[in-house]
Regions:
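Conserved Class I SAM-dependent methyltransferase catalytic core
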Residues: 14-16, 202-207, 267-340
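Conserved S-adenosyl-L-methionine
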Residues: 130-244, 249-251, 258-260, 267, ...
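Short, surface-exposed amphipathic charged segments that create phosphate/polyanion-binding patches used
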Residues: 238-240, 333-339, 369-375
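A generic structural signal for well-ordered coil/turn residues at beta-strand boundaries
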Residues: 238, 242, 333-334, 349-352, ...
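Short beta-alpha connecting loops at secondary-structure transitions
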Residues: 195, 234, 256-262, 322-323, ...
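Short acidic (Asp/Glu) and glycine-rich catalytic loops that position anionic groups and cofactors
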Residues: 95, 190, 218-223, 253-257, ...
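Non-catalytic, mostly N-terminal accessory regions of nucleic-acid modification and defense proteins
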Residues: 1-152, 222-233, 322-325, 350-359, ...
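Switch/connector loops and helix/strand junctions flanking conserved nucleotide-binding motifs
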Residues: 232-234, 249-252, 299-302, 329-332, ...
Length: 473
């Protein structure tokens, strides 16, 4: 990676490059090289001693393979592919380094998957790449997965998949519990690898990275390149679970979605994703979702209020986690996680909502104070009704125990009835405690950072106002 950085290659370009080259190696390991023309197969690059000749052949491969292959997967990976490398020696360095790994050893495969994920995170932090919007912090992903507690045989989906982090974490959760699926029947193992997890991603580059990320983690999931908020999204339903962090911002130009099945179509993308998600769950009283959403979803009037009311009718919206600011690469965005279970009926499924305030009087997360799993410890105990964080994956099966929750003594944790929420115009912008009611408020933030945050919020409000003005016409 450092060699390529010296060649002026950004993490974003490097990831694409690594994806193109890794897939060639994987095609050899997995035995589907017949879909790649012989002169472009992995061994031909490894055994070529002339760096310039090897690099020229690689460039030809990228230009031609999408037209020459019959494999849909290969077409997806190499769609509109081109190289960012300038020096032939750097291509050869990558090829040799990848070939030196023992790909038939599970530990080396896991290492490659971990390396790829760490590059995705570095890419997200590189502001000029704009990739931060596709990246959810790993500790948050893992906690959401563990609290949702996926089961074998269930179908899970991410309608805004990014680089597929939620589904990969859910798969790893089950592999850890069930000995990497080794004890499953061939039929059940095939289901877990191919059908249990799926996703949709709108952006071509992110979709390519998602496909590669899944393959490196031993998954052969369907990841569709498309827009969930268009007609194709209507067919995404009947899921046992959804995990998602829909992209921030309004739909471009204030446009409404092209879905005719939404009861409340709006120009607010997150509200549309929320509608899609609760409609995509099985109506069995067990299907569940955990979704990252910005504050405006909690308080927006008009269609926003109607969608929240519809959500609380169709689902048991049992928990809202008010997340700290500064944990996403999009500066100043205030976010929450909504946890809900689809009811078997269409009305009155939410008796009340538990709120946990992880935002008020907490450290400013950043380089000096990294955001880690331990930040969630008190929330985990509240959510589960007393399960210790270290035993979450073994002692918690996802069941919400209301009686145990009521016994939790934590001033950040409070229950608000559905009737009270209704009196507040169905606003869910609740559950934040007064700043001075918690003693450890010694880090209230850098004034410059706070000013930047305020500017960011003003920009967001301006965009929404412009969208509304356009709608009103």
């Amino acid at each position: 990676c450092n060699v390529l950085r010296d060649d002026g290659v950004t993490y974003h370009q490097y990831l694409n490059e690594l994806t193109y080259i890794l897939f060639l190696k994987l095609s050899e390991v997995k035995g589907f090289e017949e879909h790649i023309p012989e002169q472009y197969r992995w061994r031909s690059f490894v055994e070529e001693t002339d760096n310039t000749e090897s690099f020229q052949r690689y460039r030809s491969f990228l230009a031609e393979v999408s037209n020459e292959t019959t494999s849909a997967g290969i077409k997806e990976i190499y769609a509109n592919a081109s190289t960012s490398l300038r020096k032939p020696v750097n291509f050869n360095t990558l090829v040799q380094a990848i070939d030196d790994l023992d790909w038939y050893e599970e530990t080396d495969r896991d290492v490659m998957g971990d390396i790829y994920e760490s590059l995705l995170e570095k890419n997200a932090g590189e502001k000029k790449s704009g990739a931060g919007q596709y990246f959810t912090p790993r500790p948050l992903i893992n906690i959401m997965v563990e609290l949702m507690s996926p089961k074998l045989g269930e179908r899970w989906n991410d309608p805004a998949a990014g680089t597929f982090g939620f589904m990969i974490s859910a798969d790893e959760y089950l592999r850890t519990k069930y000995d990497n699926y080794f004890d499953l029947s061939e039929k059940d193992r095939k289901f877990q690898i191919e059908k249990a997890f799926s996703g949709v991603e709108l952006v071509g580059d992110a979709h390519r990275l998602a496909l590669m990320n899944a393959r490196l983690h031993g998954m052969e999931s369907e990841i569709i390149l498309g827009d969930t908020l268009t007609e194709m999204g209507k067919g995404l339903n009947g899921f046992d679970g959804v995990l998602a962090n829909p992209p921030f911002g309004t739909k471009k130009g204030g446009e409404r979605p092209t879905r005719d099945d939404f009861t409340y179509p709006t120009s607010n993308k997150q509200l549309n994703f929320l509608q899609h998600i609760y409609r995509s769950l099985k109506k069995d009283g067990k299907a569940r979702a955990a979704v990252v959403l910005p504050d405006n979803v909690l308080f927006e009037d008009g269609d926003g209020q109607k969608i929240r009311r519809d959500l609380m009718d169709k689902c048991n919206l049992h928990t809202i986690l008010r997340l700290p600011t500064g944990i996403f690469y999009a500066a100043g965005v205030k976010t929450n996680v909504l946890f809900f279970t689809r009811g078997t009926t269409e009305t009155e499924n939410t008796p009340g909502v538990w709120f946990y305030d992880m935002r008020t009087n907490v450290p400013n997360y950043g380089k000096r104070t990294p955001f880690t799993r331990t930040a969630f410890n008190d929330f985990i105990e509240a959510y589960t009704g007393g399960v210790k964080p270290d035993s979450l994956t073994t002692a918690f099966d996802g069941t919400i125990n209301e009686n145990a929750r009521k016994k939790v003594d934590n001033e950040r944790w409070q229950y608000i009835t559905r009737a009270t929420i209704a009196k507040k115009n169905d606003s869910l912008d609740l559950g934040l405690i007064a700043d001075d009611s918690i003693s450890n408020g010694d880090d209230l933030g850098d004034p410059i950072e706070i000013a930047k945050e305020a500017l960011s919020e003003l920009e967001s409000i301006t965009l929404q106002l412009q969208a509304m003005i356009k709608e009103l016409g």
